[in-house]
Amino acid sequence: MYSVDKSNFKSMLINFDKQIQESSEIVKNSSLNFEPSKITNILYLGMGGSAIAGNLLYDTLFDHLKVPLDVVRGYLAPAYCNEHTLVIVSSYSGNTEETLSAAEKARAGKAQFLAITSGGKLKEMAEANQWSLILIPEGFPPRQALGYIYFTLYHALGTAGLFTDYKRNLTPLVHFIQKLTVRCDQQQSDCNILSRELAKTLHGKISLIYSSAPYLQTVARRWQNQFHENSKSMAFANVLPEMNHNEIVGFEQDSTAFSHFVAIFLRDKDAHPRIEKRIELTQIIIKKHGIEIVDIYTEGHTILEKVFSLILKGDWVSYYLALSHQKDPVKIKNIDFLKSELAKL
């Protein structure tokens, strides 16, 4: 079963806690020269696995951010970028063409810049322009460097005073993640069984993944992306209550395609009562079409524990689903093809 994991993807899952542990020291050793007192908004530039940390920062700091934070995926930067903007340029490889292009566009606004990368052209750009720079360890697929990207930025923004309730000491979170990881890795544990059994349920199916705003909205997207890249499996994601205003009507279609779907609801055990009622009613509608429904709940008490408990579980499900599909979780042939063809232009 594990023979297709030629790149030892599993080791990255097991060692996620180390990324959290090392992030604070990485920031301490980084060159950060932006001026927090001048910042009135944050613009986060990134793509794929390098971008999702920006959305997670927005979600997890929803109650605490002192300034607006926008995430932009693409070649351009918005016109509002100016001298009061902190532009976070995130590219794990340092060579993401869209992000480098957007960063170049953002320079016209005379903003302050913070680059986060493992090297490449972004490192060179940051050093040449004397930007704040966070260098993180290389050797990971960008999507599996999420801990480094998210938590170094968490510490950088927190120490700068750009959000309230900053926790400098994340040891309790590290211990929480360590315990959950052991459960996900042990063959007979409940978390491992959940991950493996859900992977069996999803084999050959299309996943419809739903979460809720504001704290969990990016978690559904993370599951979707991990199913795409790791499992080589088609998946779609949406967020409640928004999907109750549009997508829910799509289930009125008379289609045999519904037999290929499985609906996964990523749920907060302390969710708003109206969200809980919406999920209940949404599931009634979906069940009418014979679509199997799976509920996965958060664990922990803090927002960080809840969010990363679901991220960890989703990563393990995507891993087992990749093995079920006889696919190496690390390989991304279609993305490699696109990059190689675009490089010829």
Please annotate each region the language model reported:
Residues 7-36, 78-83, 172, 294-308:
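Conserved, well-structured ligand/cofactor-binding cores
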Residues 22-29, 67-73, 189-192:
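Short gly/ser/thr-rich secondary-structure transition/capping motifs
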Residues 71-74, 233-244, 292-301:
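A generic structural motif
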Residues 36-182, 200, 268-271, 276, ...:
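Glycine-rich phosphate-binding loops that contact phosphosugars or nucleotide phosphates
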Residues 249-333:
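C-terminal active-site/capping subdomain that shapes the small-molecule cofactor and substrate pocket
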Residues 328-345:
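C-terminal helix-rich "cap/oligomerization" subdomain common to oxidoreductases
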Residues 5-15, 27-31, 37-40, 158-261, ...:
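Active-site phosphate/pyrophosphate-binding segments
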Residues 25-27, 66, 156-166, 231-232, ...:
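Short helix-capping/linker segments at secondary-structure and domain boundaries
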